[in-house]
């Protein structure tokens, strides 16, 4: 596989990114290997869907995932009060993490996954 730069970047965006769909299509037609898009957090859903349509194979969405997990912890009180209890932290983040992953799976492969 090949990770490509087409308007994406790691971490949080200062402004809404605009993916270069012409470049994605051009790379897809020129290369016989799967294309990977890093830095997909906060890229608008319609841009991710268009990337799928153009042949993008894999999407890395860590920042947005971590944010969803953090919100799960915060919903259950002050994270500082957890005293480093990782089991408790993981249990508190699991519902948010699962919901986030399911949502992205539905977005990127709407005909393949049902939950």
Regions found by a protein language model. Give the residues of each.
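Glycine/Thr-rich beta-alpha phosphate-binding loop at enzyme active sites
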Residues: 1-22
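Hydrophobic faces of well-ordered beta-strands that scaffold small-molecule active sites
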Residues: 2-4, 35-39, 57-61
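Glycine-rich phosphate-binding active-site loops on the catalytic face of alpha/beta enzymes
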Residues: 6-10, 54-70
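Alpha-helix-loop-beta-strand connector modules within alpha/beta enzyme cores
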Residues: 16-37
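Catalytic cores of alpha/beta
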Residues: 40-55
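Extended, intrinsically disordered, low-complexity segments
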Residues: 74-115
